[in-house]
């Protein structure tokens, strides 16, 4: 499934989604450089919790320093973007090397999280909250 570039280095690609965020992850063998929207990973993701969420597929498969990642992400907030990056990295690892499939699938990294924001209904204050009710 993995393609190779001009130099013969294996390439993998994966698209991850979470809430309204979309991440396109390009992965190839390298030193472990991670770029998000042409910025360094640490300058883009500053919260430690979000960093661990985003890099959890690499930690789980013991490939943290073995691949270079180039990520394009848009939409949503920082939490949704971290989840989209996690989903995209997991799919890219699976496309690059299928021996990671069992580990990633058993931990739920290849499954898209279907939860989205519920729409506001008319006659209500928010999606489920009603206006204040007075009996008398």
Swiss-Prot record:
Highest classification ranks of the organism: Bacteria, Pseudomonadati, Spirochaetota, Spirochaetia, Spirochaetales
Name by which UniProt lists this protein: Small ribosomal subunit protein uS9
Family to which this protein belongs: Belongs to the universal ribosomal protein uS9 family.
PANTHER family documented for this protein: RIBOSOMAL PROTEIN S9 (PTHR21569), SMALL RIBOSOMAL SUBUNIT PROTEIN US9M (PTHR21569:SF1)
One cellular component (GO) term of this entry: cytosolic small ribosomal subunit
InterPro entries in the record: Ribosomal_Su5_D2-typ_SF (IPR020568), Ribosomal_uS9 (IPR000754), Ribosomal_uS9_bac/plastid (IPR023035), Ribosomal_uS9_CS (IPR020574), Ribsml_uS5_D2-typ_fold_subgr (IPR014721)
Pfam families xrefs: Ribosomal_S9 (PF00380)
GO molecular function: RNA binding; structural constituent of ribosome
HAMAP family: Ribosomal_uS9_B
Annotated NCBIfam families: PRK00132.1
Keyword terms, alphabetized: Ribonucleoprotein, Ribosomal protein
GO biological process: translation
Organism: Borrelia hermsii (strain HS1 / DAH)
